[in-house]
């Protein structure tokens, strides 16, 4: 099996799917912007593909340049391990993970953040390969494999939500990174839908790893907030947004609401 390292010279050898932010209207996966990838290469990102007929790649970066809410100096952060139809043995996925670990054996260790549904699916895969379930924030689990013993362990570095501001009611903030024209299309579709529902919408572009860490979203590069309260990191169509808003306990989010009405 041939391993292909993508860099500024080999980036055009196939596309890379964005496996986290999926099209809300179809199962089709997005692909990253070429310029986005080139900028990430400058930050030390590495992508290794397997020379197969199906998508199979691992993407990792020095944790200091991870666009995620983590603090893990000296570690290597795994953005994605993706294999299309790997089969129950997951040997292609294991090959990619082992390659990344070997390439980064002089670092403090490896860190990966998984959505809880992915963690529940892949828990045994990572635990059997020496990763420890280390920390949690709502919806996400951090796994760590240390290569050195007496070093600080990684940590989440973010506020999940902020105190609501009763003077700025019905405000939606959409924070996003410019990863893909397709993703940006759906983000702006969400903006229109929220505005049609009567919300004031603020768009905030995330343009550095530091911004992503401080965005307030556990996903880092995308988040939707209502008056400072984190709502979702998912791309949603109109039906999804209506379900999201309908599921909120506004009395819990805004305990001062009745007082404001009475005054």
Model segments located where?
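Conserved acetyl-CoA binding element of GNAT-fold acetyltransferases
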Residues: 69-85
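Conserved beta-strand in the GNAT
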Residues: 49, 53-64, 77, 82
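Conserved GNAT acetyl-CoA-binding A-motif
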Residues: 102-117
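Conserved acetyl-CoA-binding loop-helix of GNAT-fold acetyltransferases
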Residues: 83, 88-102, 128
């Amino acid at each position: 099996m041939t391993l292909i390292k993508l860099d500024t010279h080999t980036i055009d050898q196939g596309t890379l799917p964005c496996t986290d932010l999926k099209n809300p209207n179809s199962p089709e996966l997005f692909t990253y912007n070429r310029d986005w990838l080139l900028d990430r290469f400058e930050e030390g990102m590495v992508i290794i593909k397997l020379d197969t007929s199906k998508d199979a790649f691992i993407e990792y970066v020095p944790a200091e340049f991870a666009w995620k809410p983590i603090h893990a100096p000296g570690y290597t952060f795994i953005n994605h391990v993706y294999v299309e139809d790997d089969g129950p043995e997951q040997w292609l996925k294991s090959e990619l993970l082992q390659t990344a670990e070997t390439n980064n054996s002089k670092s403090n260790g490896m860190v990966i953040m998984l959505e809880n549904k992915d963690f529940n699916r892949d828990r045994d895969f990572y635990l059997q390969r020496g990763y420890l379930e280390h920390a949690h924030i709502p919806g996400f689990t951090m796994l760590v494999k240390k290569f050195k013993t007496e070093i600080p362990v990684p940590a989440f570095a973010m506020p999940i939500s902020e105190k609501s501001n009763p003077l700025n009611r019905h405000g939606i903030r959409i924070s996003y990174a410019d990863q893909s024209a397709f993703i940006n299309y759906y983000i702006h579709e969400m903006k229109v839908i929220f505005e049609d529902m009567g919300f004031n919408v603020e768009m905030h572009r995330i343009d550095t790893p530091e911004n992503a860490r401080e965005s307030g979203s556990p996903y880092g590069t995308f988040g939707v907030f209502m008056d400072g309260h984190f709502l979702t990191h998912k791309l949603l169509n109109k039906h999804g947004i209506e379900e999201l808003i309908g599921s909120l306990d506004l009395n819990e989010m805004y305990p001062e609401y009745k007082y404001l009405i009475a005054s």
